[in-house]
């Protein structure tokens, strides 16, 4: 049966914007089934969901353990239909009825009441379809059916069409499934070098039936809330003395009211204090949007800052739309913050030159008018199936980011545009999100239909997330300019200028105006890695003139993207790029034994077993073969060389212990290599390149396999994340040993905005822990003062000048103690950091058994660790399966007699506390010992 509006009012979705005369049915409350000819049966389904997950819940398939990702390809090759049970209780007296889908993945045909309504082909768009006529002719309660076509089959058919766009051979990059560039779907669904290829399908975001019961009734589809300084332009530094401007624009479904008014109320979320209530000016109606603006003259809201730079002050903004008769038509609430964020790509000024900064152009971020050092990593999709990514999981992941002293994540394309709740978490925790449009490592079609489709995608998502203070940037895509255009130049030199034109047509002439038309507060870069622009002329057909192939000697432009799998130069500072900002760099490693055991049988836990090799997708298969041993051997060999070149080679008699030791060894190499690069990049803040950012690849894993991640699937920290937490502290001391020339320099680097002063103690020990006579000719303590956002060399020598009896039996311990003011703080803070240097590679050191002892404190989650007989390098505390968390300190150095009390933060425990009895400790010595 159907209901009147009075009875239905109680069913309004409580989290949706409120509007006049609407009835909303959340389709997740309905019962659903999933069917396919490939399955020949019907199973219960959820909504939102994806096919693989419903089949898993129904017991049709198992988890993708072992090589089961290959065995599940039949799912991606089939068409699947989600069908609702008859939907009861819709209104009889409605003016119009709509189906609203916040996300369909991807090629979907929608039927309602037995009538085909529409087809969709973009995972990232919101769709609304008028089904009033279909419902009116429906005999009985309506049934909604959504048929999802096989994405691999559909894009293959598009590619084979003679009218489809073609590209030069050897340009496009295929990981597993081919032809991903023809679809507006998560590109990594077709495989990447760190994850599987499931090509999932399904209603991956919520959907609603919306009924409007009056002609003036509306439904709010999307809201664009833009907060910026008066006169602010996306590509110019905002004037911080100007008042704030609030621009509110609401996209509605239904008839636009004539001569509407708009008002806002701005309330402090912490205190509840109202900052202002006012009517908006210049209210306009265009398309399906109602827009108004106001200037907050004389008001000084508390600013939002990234973590480590200040507080995350947030405000609730209530936006109300009223009709000509002062009746409320719609009301929307958005939580936001007052901040400016600006990507500075302007030319180096004479004043900067006078400070010692090399010529060229800037490439760094400024928040609220302040330069800062961006410390962070790259975020990939946290799961192969977005519908099982929870707010709890993302909150835990972002907590690890904050604890890890990171203030920025690059949201890599091509995954998916992040859900609103993920931006909410970033707002709360102070994590800036460099965001990108979902185009990656490919050339894409440039026909009008494709461009029209992606234009709608971009407008929707730019408007959707614009109110979040954590939003830091929009980039057009991943490595299009730095990788794909050079690939064209190599493969088809005569066509290079044509494809540059195609690139500019899409990423500059189309995307840039779409961003600028919908936000004044966010900068835009056409690609993740560029050399910046020559000039911007918004009236020109190509409004941003890019700087391609810069070769100006002594000048620095743009950001850098760096991967070098030649392990012989892993610690050669001369092999690292010198630039203004490092947005992507890294090397892969194995996950821990505990994580492997979640997905791989015991008999397969060998370093080069078939299962381990085939779960390694670097180098990628480049197609759908299931025997990618040759390409995988490249990546496995790179990890092997990283270990054997620098670290003791594990050789345990028990194959599980040996496998675990090898996994750990690859993590040691990875962590040391990243540490070496980040120390180099951070030191660059005080060098002519004025380097102000390092975002390593990558934050987290999508499954259990070798990858570049610092956090494994399931939440366990690799050595990498612990080391990054240490080296991203505000003030650090770093040794720089040039193994070719023998030079040894020690630098102090600071991210603070004002000078910090203190001392660095330099202590030479042999590996038994005895002081080296005369401290090897090195001063025992060096005072220093380091400027804000700067670095300073505090000591330098050559190894040949040191009084070291044996460089293989020596370690330099560096202990920094300083005082300084954290950004936006009036108090002086004590700052400490410890580091070390050896003048031989770990494999060549004459290490001794450090005699590690571990004890349990009266506090259940605290342990004490002590070295009794030698220097413990790479001291590593580990915990068993059944618990997830992290030690407050790990991967550290202990001298004999030194004792550390270290707490463990428990995030999840299924052992009822028994895990504490199985904490272990090891060091580099254990990697060397045969057993």
UniProtKB/Swiss-Prot annotation:
Residues 1-21 form the signal peptide. Keywords: Carbohydrate metabolism, Glycoprotein, Glycosidase, Hydrolase, Polysaccharide degradation, Secreted, Signal. It comes from the Eukaryota. Pfam families: Glyco_hydro_2, Glyco_hydro_2_N2, Ig_mannosidase, Mannosidase_ig. It is an enzyme of class 3 (hydrolase). Pathway: Glycan metabolism; N-glycan degradation. GO terms for molecular function: beta-mannosidase activity. The active site is at 479 (proton donor). One of its GO terms (biological process) is glycoprotein catabolic process. Glycans are attached at residues 40, 79, 247, 282, 316, 326, 347, 550, 608, 658, 738, 790, 798, 830, 918. Disulfide bonds: none annotated. SUPFAM superfamilies: (Trans)glycosidases, beta-Galactosidase/glucuronidase domain, Galactose-binding domain-like. Its EC number is 3.2.1.25. It is found in: Secreted. GO terms for cellular component: extracellular region. It catalyses: Hydrolysis of terminal, non-reducing beta-D-mannose residues in beta-D-mannosides. Homodimer. Belongs to the glycosyl hydrolase 2 family. Beta-mannosidase A subfamily. PANTHER family: BETA-MANNOSIDASE, BETA-MANNOSIDASE A. Exoglycosidase that cleaves the single beta-linked mannose residue from the non-reducing end of beta-mannosidic oligosaccharides of various complexity and length. Involved in the degradation of polymeric mannan and galactomannan. This is Beta-mannosidase A. It comes from Aspergillus niger (strain ATCC MYA-4892 / CBS 513.88 / FGSC A1513).
């Amino acid at each position: 049966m159907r209901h009147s509006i009075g009875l239905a009012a109680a069913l309004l979705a409580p989290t949706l914007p409120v509007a006049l005369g609407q009835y909303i049915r959340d389709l997740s409350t309905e019962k659903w089934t999933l069917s396919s000819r490939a399955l020949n049966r019907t199973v219960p389904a959820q909504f939102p969901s994806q096919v693989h997950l419903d089949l898993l819940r129904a017991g049709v398939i198992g988890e993708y353990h072992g090589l089961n990702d290959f065995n599940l390809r039949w799912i991606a090759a089939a068409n699947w239909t989600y069908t609702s049970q008859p939907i009861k209780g819709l209104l009889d007296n409605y003016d119009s009825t709509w189906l609203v889908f916040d996300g369909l993945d991807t090629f979907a045909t929608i039927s309602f009441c037995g009538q085909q309504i529409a087809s969709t082909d973009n995972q990232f768009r919101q769709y609304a379809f008028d089904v009033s006529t279909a419902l009116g002719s429906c005999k009985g309660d309506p049934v909604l059916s959504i048929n999802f076509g096989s994405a691999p089959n559909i894009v293959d058919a598009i590619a084979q069409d003679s009218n489809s766009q073609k590209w030069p051979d050897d340009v496009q990059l295929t990981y597993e499934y081919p032809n991903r560039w023809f679809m507006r779907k998560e590109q990594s669904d077709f495989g990447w070098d760190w994850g599987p290829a499931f090509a999932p399908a399904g209603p991956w975001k919520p959907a609603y039936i919306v009924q409007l019961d009056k002609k003036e009734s509306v439904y709010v589809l999307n809201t664009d809330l833009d907060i910026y300084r008066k006169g602010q332009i996306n590509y110019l530094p905002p004037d911080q003395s100007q008042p704030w401007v609030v621009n509110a624009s609401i996209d509605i479904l239904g008839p636009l009211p004539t001569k509407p008014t708009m008002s806002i109320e701005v309330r402090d979320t912490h205190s509840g204090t109202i900052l202002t209530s006012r009517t908006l000016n210049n209210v306009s109606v265009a398309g399906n949007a109602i827009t108004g603006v106001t200037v907050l003259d004389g008001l000084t809201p508390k600013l939002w800052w990234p973590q480590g730079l200040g507080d995350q002050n947030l405000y609730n903004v209530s936006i109300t739309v009223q009709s000509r008769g002062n009746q409320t038509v719609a009301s929307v609430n958005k939580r936001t913050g007052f901040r400016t964020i600006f990507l500075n790509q302007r030319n180096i000024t004479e004043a900067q030159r006078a400070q010692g900064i090399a010529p060229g152009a800037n490439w760094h971020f400024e928040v609220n008018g302040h330069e800062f050092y961006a410390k962070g990593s790259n975020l990939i999709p946290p799961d192969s199936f977005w519908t099982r990514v929870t707010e709890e999981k993302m909150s835990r992941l972002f907590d690890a980011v904050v604890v890890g002293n990171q203030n920025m994540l690059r949201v890599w394309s091509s995954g998916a545009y992040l859900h609103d709740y993920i931006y909410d978490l970033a707002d709360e925790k102070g994590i800036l999100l460099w965001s990108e449009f979902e185009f990656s490592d490919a050339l894409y079609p440039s026909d009008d239909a494709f461009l029209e489709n992606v234009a709608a995608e971009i407008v929707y998502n730019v408007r959707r997330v614009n109110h979040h203070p954590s939003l830091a940037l929009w980039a057009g895509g991943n490595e299009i300019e730095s990788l794909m255009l050079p690939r064209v130049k190599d493969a088809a030199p005569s066509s290079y200028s044509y494809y540059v034109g195609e690139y500019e047509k899409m990423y500059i002439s189309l995307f840039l105006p779409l961003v600028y038309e919908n936000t004044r507060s966010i900068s835009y870069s056409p690609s993740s890695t560029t050399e910046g622009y020559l000039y911007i002329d918004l009236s020109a057909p190509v409004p941003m003139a890019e700087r391609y192939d810069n070769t100006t000697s002594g000048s620095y432009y743009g950001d850098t993207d760096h991967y070098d799998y030649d392990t012989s130069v892993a610690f050669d500072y001369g092999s690292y790029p010198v630039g203004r900002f490092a947005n992507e760099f890294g090397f892969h490693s194995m996950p821990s034994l505990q994580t492997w055991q979640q997905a791989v049988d015991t008999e397969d836990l060998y370093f080069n077993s078939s299962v381990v090799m085939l779960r390694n997708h670097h180098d990628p298969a480049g197609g759908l073969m299931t025997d990618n041993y040759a390409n995988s051997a490249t990546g496995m060999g790179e990890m092997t060389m990283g270990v054997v070149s620098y670290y003791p080679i594990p050789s345990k008699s028990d194959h599980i212990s040996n496998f675990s030791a090898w996994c750990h060894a690859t993590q040691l190499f990875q962590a040391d290599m990243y540490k070496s690069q980040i120390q180099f990049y951070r030191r660059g803040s005080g060098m002519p390149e004025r380097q102000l950012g390092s975002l390593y690849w990558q934050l987290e894993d999508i499954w259990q396999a070798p990858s570049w991640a610092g956090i494994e699937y399931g939440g366990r920290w690799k050595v990498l994340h612990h080391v990054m937490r240490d080296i991203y502290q505000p003030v650090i001391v770093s040794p720089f040993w040039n193994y070719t020339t023998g030079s040894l320099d020690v630098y102090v680097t600071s991210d603070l905005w004002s000078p910090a002063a203190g001392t660095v103690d330099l202590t030479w020990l042999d590996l038994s822990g005895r002081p080296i006579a005369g401290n090897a000719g090195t001063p025992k303590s060096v005072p220093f003062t380091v400027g804000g956002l700067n670095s300073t060399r505090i000591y330098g020598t050559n190894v040949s000048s040191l009084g070291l009896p044996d460089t293989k039996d020596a370690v330099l311990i560096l202990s920094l103690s300083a005082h300084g003011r954290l950004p936006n703080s009036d108090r002086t803070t004590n700052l400490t950091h410890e580091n070390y240097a050896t003048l031989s590679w770990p494999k060549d050191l004459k290490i001794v058994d450090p005699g590690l002892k571990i004890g349990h404190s009266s506090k259940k989650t605290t342990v004490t660790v002590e070295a009794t007989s030698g220097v413990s390098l790479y001291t590593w505390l580990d915990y068993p399966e059944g618990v997830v968390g992290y030690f407050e300190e790990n991967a550290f150095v202990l001298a004999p007699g030194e004792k550390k009390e270290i707490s463990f933060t428990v995030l999840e425990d299924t052992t009822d506390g028994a895990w504490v009895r199985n904490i272990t400790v090891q060091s580099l010595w254990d990697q060397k010992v045969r057993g």
